[in-house]
């Protein structure tokens, strides 16, 4: 399945919540009717079945992290093999993606922009260039912007936006040096309460 390249606000309206696909500090609900789905009949909210509710939650999380279906299923399989809560394991695995860590550190204003920085070889992990967005970042890894990429206006703009957001406690960032450390895996309480990962577990357990 190809990566979605259409309007980002439409995806947030489809899921009925801000997926943080647009850059900026403020939530998008002030300019987007999140309670109304896109399309001519968007105002008519269909009653979802149990399966439909589970599917919507999976799609929401998949779109937040910008992961394709096959990748997402593989993350679930890995999460199920790990000890502990499968749903929490899944979210932690998604959080260790390099593109997500770059976003969390504030070097990209969105995960899509962070993914592009990684793909364009603007990001290093422990001093080595890594251009794979799905690269798994481990505790104490140092993520930095390559020296020749540090003059990019979009990175500076992203850091300015990030300075106004609540900073994740599991990363430590030196904005002046454009580098940060991934200190630990985030706890479930660190992540969005708007995600119900148990619905995803129920969906894939069928």
Curated annotation (Swiss-Prot):
Protein name from the UniProt record: Small ribosomal subunit protein uS4
InterPro entries in the record: Ribosomal_uS4, Ribosomal_uS4_bac-type, Ribosomal_uS4_CS, Ribosomal_uS4_N, S4_RNA-bd, S4_RNA-bd_sf
Keyword annotations of the record: Ribonucleoprotein, Ribosomal protein, RNA-binding, rRNA-binding
Domain S4 RNA-binding: residue ranges: 96-156
Gene Ontology MF terms in the entry: rRNA binding; structural constituent of ribosome
Any matching Pfam family: S4
Top-level taxonomy: Bacteria, Pseudomonadati, Pseudomonadota, Gammaproteobacteria, Alteromonadales
One of the GO biological process terms: translation
Subunit structure: Part of the 30S ribosomal subunit. Contacts protein S5. The interaction surface between S4 and S5 is involved in control of translational fidelity.
Organism in which the protein naturally occurs: Shewanella amazonensis (strain ATCC BAA-1098 / SB2B)
Cytoplasm as UniProt keyword: no
UniProt cross-references to NCBIfam families, sorted A to Z: PRK05327.1, rpsD_bact
SMART domains: Ribosomal_S4, S4
Intrachain disulfide bonds: none
Family recorded in the similarity comment: Belongs to the universal ribosomal protein uS4 family.
Main function: One of the primary rRNA binding proteins, it binds directly to 16S rRNA where it nucleates assembly of the body of the 30S subunit. With S5 and S12 plays an important role in translational accuracy.
PROSITE patterns to which the protein is assigned, alphabetical: RIBOSOMAL_S4, S4
């Amino acid at each position: 399945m190809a990566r979605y390249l259409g309007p980002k606000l439409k995806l947030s309206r489809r899921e009925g919540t801000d997926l943080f696909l647009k850059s900026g500090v403020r939530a998008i609900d002030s300019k987007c009717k999140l309670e109304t789905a896109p399309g001519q009949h968007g105002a008519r909210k269909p009653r979802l079945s149990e399966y439909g509710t589970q599917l919507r939650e999976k799609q929401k999380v998949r779109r937040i992290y910008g992961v394709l279906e096959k990748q997402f299923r593989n993350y679930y399989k890995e999460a199920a093999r790990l000890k502990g809560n499968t749903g929490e394991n899944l979210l932690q695995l998604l959080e260790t993606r390099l593109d997500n860590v770059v976003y969390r550190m504030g070097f990209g204003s969105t995960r899509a922009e962070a993914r592009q920085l990684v793909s364009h070889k603007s990001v290093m992990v422990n001093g080595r260039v890594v251009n794979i967005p799905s690269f798994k970042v481990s505790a104490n890894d140092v993520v930095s912007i390559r020296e020749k990429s540090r003059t990019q206006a979009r990175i500076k703009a992203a850091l300015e936006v990030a300075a106004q957001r609540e900073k994740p406690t599991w990363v430590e960032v030196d904005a002046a040096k454009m580098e940060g450390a991934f200190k630990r895996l985030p706890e479930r309480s660190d992540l969005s309460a708007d995600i119900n990962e148990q619905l995803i577990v129920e969906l894939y357990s069928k």
